[in-house]
């Protein structure tokens, strides 16, 4: 009886975890390319500009490039 209850609880937790994962992935991601004013892209400046403009996460493409890729949740 204890094994059956433990198995049932485990299955409920597993199913709820899968449902939660599916609903979180429904948000559409948008991308924007930001040009940094410096000669080289700096990670902190890229992240700050992306957060201020879109509320997202900014990542430098390359340290020798001036391109910053901003990823954020689309509202529409």
Curated annotation (Swiss-Prot):
Tell me which Pfam families the record gives. Answer: SLR1-BP
The entry's keywords = Antimicrobial, Disulfide bond, Fungicide, Plant defense, Secreted, Signal
Report the superkingdom from the record: Eukaryota
Q: Where in the cell is it found?
A: Secreted
| A biological process from GO | killing of cells of another organism
* Signal peptide annotation: 1-25
Q: List the disulfide bonds.
A: 30-74, 41-60, 46-68, 50-70
Instruction: Tell me which InterPro entries the record gives.
Output: DEFL
Q: What is this protein called?
A: Defensin-like protein 125
- On whether Membrane is a keyword of this UniProt record, the answer is no
Example of a GO cellular component annotation carried by this entry: extracellular region
Entry keyword Heme:
no
Family assignment from sequence similarity: Belongs to the DEFL family.
